[in-house]
């Protein structure tokens, strides 16, 4: 580093050398300045003026800056663009500095470690995820420092990557950090960027001798799985290195217990539009949108978690149902709870800001306001019959002493800054009151002093005043300036007056300014003491916050059931789903001029295990199948459902194959995307799963598609035995009802009126061999000439199909090829040598084509 630079620039370069991966915000007075390459980057990304600063060399160094009081807005913009920010503060008083002011980086802000309200969505968690691998085991640890939540998940064996991807998609991390050495890291990083585009991805290699934090946070190092311990430890180290603050609010570690929840992969979450819709990625038109009548930010986040993690245990589901049912019938209690919950601020994030030292007095007022309504909430819940509500009532702590202290200490509308006074109530601290008395008596003293000086000098027009630049002064007009006594010292000359100072006024000024400075110092000290008092109760406050979040969700579900006429589904362990007059919870809310047509559903492990649904496009097949999946999911999250009556068994997984489009990120065609999704279903579904398949095989030729569709159905029927809804335009497949036990045909009822059709939206028993595609084209407004020609061609195809119809016959096992066949042996050897698990879909497809070509050559074109 050259010594030709000024000391300040040398100091900057020394700090920057240690933070080469971050944009360095360097505090200079009231601004954060950026220099050199950082200045060029910040100027471009923030659209702020790029200037130059003399730095000791001939050419000025690039520089730009932002005001410290509005820095959060600028940081938010950079974080959203994926940058990391290092905040370098002045850590000593410039007045006391001997030479250049000491500065150091006090925190590093990354996408996963933000606490700024500008970057936090109050209804969504913001997770940092750390990923580590050891042999055949993958482990992730996730923390939201804005709420204090910390959890882990691990998976081993061939399915570990799939399991980790499912959790990553559910968590939707803001930042994913991988410990160096993960196999196939590049593929996983590409996957997360395609599924969660806003997630920042990086690789971490920690320094040797890093401190240990696990026991400090969780009280013990006692974790059976070494990889879990190490992954969580690395996560905590990363947080401490970046946040550089006390993180004691991260005090509870939980395992993501996959076996306790219904499994929903990324495809199911997307296709069912649980959290985001598929049109613009917003909340509108989603299940979350329909169910969200929460009153608190904590409740909104918890509701999302309940939707993403439906329960499997019948007793836990019933416990939630009982609570929702009681809140539904007790209208007055529900309304009162909603009113009280609306007064609750985001306690989880308030205590997090208190813990890391970024809270201000307004946060303490928000905490106080929240504590004020807790006695009324407990009173409302005290006599509930629901055991869950009783337990949640017990978990709400009153914190009465803390509330009383905050009420006495903090004014109702404190300033944003905690360093400039104005926070503490009069009467809370005797010393502070005395200082305020000195500072507030200045007007009376000035009036008396002015009268005294007028009498002493005989100048009746003089005035005693004050401004922030020159302090206190005596102002005398130009015409009277010759009459001032000798002890008047000129301080400022104006156009028509002179301003003076005298020793007595100067002494008073020092006394007042000293009092104001002491007030600011004492108020800040009192604030820090209050903060410490809150920190000592953080565990109890967090428990209260979690209880309030769960209460809020239960109240929300009861409100939805009341407003939309939902019923409580009966639970069974008979592997049976029977829904009477079920309705799609989202679609019925979006209909403005129509009444949603309800439908019945029966699925079981006996005579109606696989339902084939035929009928025209636009008639409601996809809506119906999604509806069934959503009602099952809502049941398992403890919600009531839109139906007249229902009895539903829990399912371990919901799989969906509904619609498809090209995946440009991985270079896959629509058909390849479809086949990949089907392959995942066939690999991971169990007999306790619910499978939704819509138009499997439509992305290829008719006979290829029909063959694939039938083969998939047979595999599910014979091998998996899962409950399945299968919509198809291949009406030839309806004949499977006659040759496969447990397969039933249903179709969408249609009423014909001449050349027109009316979709009745009713799912009725029996298949149909008509797709009504030409009728749909007519509804879409295609030219009459095109419609007429299409009808003629359709009749030709129908005649041909009648003559050359495909016969559905029971599946017969193929005879084994003769062992002496060199051709068969050759192919067999090639196939046995393949490492199928290491193949990409494209490689597998290419290999299949090669084998087919060889089979044609060796088999004489067969």
Predicted features by range, described:
Residues 1-326, 335, 339-342, 346-355, ...:
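Charged catalytic and DNA/RNA-contacting regions of genome-maintenance
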Residues 2, 36-39, 225, 295-296, ...:
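ATPase nucleotide-binding head domains, primarily ABC-like/P-loop NTPase cores
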Residues 88, 111-120, 246, 382-388, ...:
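Active-site phosphate-binding and catalytic loops of NTP-dependent enzymes
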Residues 206-213, 263, 274, 278, ...:
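Amphipathic heptad-repeat alpha-helical coiled-coil/stalk segments that mediate oligomerization
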Residues 338-341, 365-368, 542-550, 554-558:
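Hydrophobic alpha-helical segments characteristic of transmembrane helices
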Residues 382-385, 414, 450-453, 457, ...:
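Coiled-coil heptad-register positions
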Residues 467, 835-862:
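Terminal-proximal interaction/regulatory segments of ATP-powered molecular machines
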Residues 494, 498-532:
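Extended, charged coiled-coil "arm/hinge" scaffolds of SMC/Rad50-like chromosome-maintenance ATPases
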């Amino acid at each position: 580093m050259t010594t030709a630079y000024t000391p300040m620039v040398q100091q900057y370069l020394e700090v920057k050398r240690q933070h080469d991966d971050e944009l360095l915000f360097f505090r200079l007075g009231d601004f954060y300045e950026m220099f050199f390459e950082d200045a060029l980057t910040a100027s471009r990304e923030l659209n702020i003026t790029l200037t130059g600063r003399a730095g000791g060399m001939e050419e000025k160094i690039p520089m730009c800056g932002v005001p410290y009081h509005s820095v959060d807005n600028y940081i938010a913009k950079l974080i959203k663009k994926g940058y990391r920010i290092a905040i370098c503060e002045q850590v000593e008083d410039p007045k006391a500095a001997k030479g250049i002011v000491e500065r150091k980086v006090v925190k590093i802000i990354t996408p996963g470690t933000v606490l700024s309200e500008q970057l936090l969505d109050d209804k969504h968690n913001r997770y940092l995820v750390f990923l580590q691998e050891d042999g055949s085991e993958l482990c992730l640890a996730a923390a939201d420092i804005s709420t204090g939540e910390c959890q882990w998940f691990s998976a081993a064996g061939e399915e570990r990557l799939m399991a980790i991807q499912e959790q990553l998609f559910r968590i939707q991390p803001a930042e994913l950090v991988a410990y160096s050495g993960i196999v196939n890291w590049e593929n996983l990083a590409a996957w997360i960027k395609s599924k969660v585009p806003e997630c920042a991805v990086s690789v971490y290699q920690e320094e040797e001798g890093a401190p240990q934090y696990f026991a400090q946070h969780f009280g013990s190092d006692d974790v059976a799985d070494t990889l879990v311990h190490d992954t969580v430890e690395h996560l905590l180290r990363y947080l401490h290195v970046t946040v550089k603050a006390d993180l004691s609010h991260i005090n509870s570690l939980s395992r993501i217990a996959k076996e306790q929840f219904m499994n929903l992969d990324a495809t199911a979450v997307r296709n069912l539009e649980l959290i985001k819709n598929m049109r613009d990625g917003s909340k509108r038109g989603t299940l979350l949108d329909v169910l969200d009548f929460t009153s608190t930010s904590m409740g909104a986040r918890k509701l999302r978690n309940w939707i993403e993690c439906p329960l499997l245990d019948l007793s836990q589901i019933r416990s939630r149902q009982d609570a929702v049912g009681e809140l539904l019938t007790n209208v007055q209690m529900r309304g009162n709870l909603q009113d009280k919950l609306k007064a609750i601020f985001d306690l989880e994030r308030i205590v997090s800001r208190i813990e890391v030292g970024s809270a201000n007095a307004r946060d303490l007022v928000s905490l106080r306001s929240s504590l004020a309504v807790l006695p009324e909430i407990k009173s409302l819940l005290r006599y509930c019959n629901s055991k869950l509500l009783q337990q949640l009532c017990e978990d709400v702590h009153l914190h009465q002493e803390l509330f009383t202290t905050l009420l006495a200490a903090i004014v109702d509308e404190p300033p944003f800054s905690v360093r400039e006074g104005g926070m503490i109530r009069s009467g809370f601290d005797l010393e502070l009151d005395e200082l305020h008395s000195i500072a507030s008596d200045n007007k009376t003293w000035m009036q008396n002093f002015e009268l005294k000086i007028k009498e002493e000098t005989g100048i009746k027009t003089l005035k005693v005043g004050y401004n922030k630049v020159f302090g206190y002064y005596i102002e005398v007009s130009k015409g009277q300036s010759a009459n001032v006594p000798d002890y008047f010292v000129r301080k400022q000359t104006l156009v028509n007056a002179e301003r003076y100072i005298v020793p007595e006024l100067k002494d008073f000024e020092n006394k007042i300014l000293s009092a104001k400075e002491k007030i600011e110092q004492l108020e800040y000290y009192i604030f820090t003491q209050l903060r410490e008092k809150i920190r000592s109760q953080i565990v109890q406050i967090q428990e209260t916050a979690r209880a309030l979040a769960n209460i809020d969700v239960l109240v929300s579900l009861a409100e939805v059931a009341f407003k939309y006429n939902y019923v409580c589904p009966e639970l069974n362990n008979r592997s049976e789903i029977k829904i009477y007059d079920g309705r799609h919870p989202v679609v019925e809310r979006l209909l403005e001029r129509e009444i949603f047509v309800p439908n019945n559903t029966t699925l079981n492990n006996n005579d109606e295990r696989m339902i084939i649904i035929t009928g025209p496009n636009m008639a409601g097949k996809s809506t119906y199948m999604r509806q069934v999946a959503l009602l099952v999911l809502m049941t398992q999250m403890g919600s009531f459902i839109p139906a007249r009556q229902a009895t539903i068994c829990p399912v371990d997984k919901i799989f969906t194959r509904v619609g498809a489009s090209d995946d440009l990120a991985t270079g896959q065609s629509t058909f390849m995307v479809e086949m990949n999704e089907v392959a995942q279903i066939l690999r991971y579904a169990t007999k306790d799963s619910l499978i939704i398949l819509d138009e499997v095989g439509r992305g290829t030729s008719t006979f290829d598609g029909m063959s694939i569709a039938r083969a998939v159905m047979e595999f599910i029927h014979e091998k998996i035995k899962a409950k399945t809804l299968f919509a198809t335009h291949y009406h030839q497949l309806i004949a499977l009802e006659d040759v496969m036990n447990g397969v039933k045909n249903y179709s969408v009822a249609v009423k014909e009126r001449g050349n027109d059709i009316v979709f009745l939206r009713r799912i009725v028993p029996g298949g149909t061999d008509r797709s009504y595609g030409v009728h749909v084209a007519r509804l879409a407004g295609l030219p009459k000439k095109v419609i007429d020609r299409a009808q003629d061609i359709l009749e030709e195809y129908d005649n041909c199909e009648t003559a050359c119809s495909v016969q559905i016959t029971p599946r017969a096992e193929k005879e084994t090829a003769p062992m002496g066949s060199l051709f068969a042996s050759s192919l067999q050897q090639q196939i046995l040598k393949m490492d199928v698990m290491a193949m990409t879909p494209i490689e597998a497809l290419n290999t299949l084509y090669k084998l087919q070509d060889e089979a044609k050559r060796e088999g004489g074109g067969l």
